[in-house]
Amino acid sequence: MKNEINAVLENMTTTIPEPEDYTGEDGLLYCGKCRKPKEAYFAPDKAAIFGRDRHPAECDCQRTAREEREAAEKRRRHLDTVEELKRRGFTDPTMRDWTFENDNGRNPQTGIARRYVEHWEDMRTDNIGCLFWGGVGTGKSYLAGCIANALMEKEIPVHMTNFALILNDLAASFEGRNEYISRLCRYPLLILDDFGMERGTEYGLEQVFNVIDSRYRSGKPLIVTTNLTLDDLHNPEDTAHSRIYDRLLSMCVPVRFTGDNFRQETAQRKMESMKKLITD
């Protein structure tokens, strides 16, 4: 043990010189590049403790190298964290590509999505969610994914899924319904995509309500995308739908999506590309 302690003390108090280093007039080792000392003298009382009069000091070159190493390590840890968040947070790998950077800029609601991210702390504190509603292919899911990706890049956990998957998971869950729903509610932001497309059985509607109600009680924001209209949501067909929609509208600010069907445009471009390839 004594030898180990001595080895540690030796490492703490000894500087290994580089070929270009030199000894200054004060007797300390200096860096041959930046001309700053690589050693400093102990105070007299400390010198007695360590049995020597000097200890290593950082020159400018060493400080720069250390800061670069620390920055690289910080970047690596950040990338690892974001990768893990996206692995857990997305139920479809293609969602990773739904980013503001990849956006074509044509959706008029992009600004709202960006501001949601910019003001996330306020949204989180005030429990403000969004209900993205509108026609098929108008970019609702894409912008919800942009929000998810942007927040995860800030190391904020987000989960984006849909009720079809949730109902399947609940049916196959070994951890129990309550624990599964509690896990969903632990995410700072939950995004439910394609709401209203799930099967409308009594069991299905009950689980939909349980998830939304649990999220409501958690006090955490929720973003929902749906092809349903506000008229559909304000005029439910029965009591089961009424209590679901009521909870939803109390949590989420409606944002209407209008305009071109981007999926149809993409399909048309692919068709034209195929025609060109097979006719050339």
Model-derived regions: residue spans:
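A short, basic N-terminal segment
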Residues: 1-104, 267-280
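Pre-Walker A (pre-P-loop) alpha-helix and adjacent loop at the N terminus of AAA/AAA+ ATPase modules
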Residues: 88-90, 94-130
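Short glycine-rich substrate-engagement loop in P-loop NTPases that contacts/grips substrate
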Residues: 108-117, 148-189, 199-206
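Walker A/P-loop nucleotide-binding motif
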Residues: 124-144
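Residue-level preference for the first positions of well-ordered beta-strands
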Residues: 127-131, 158, 189, 221
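Walker B catalytic acidic pair
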Residues: 194-195
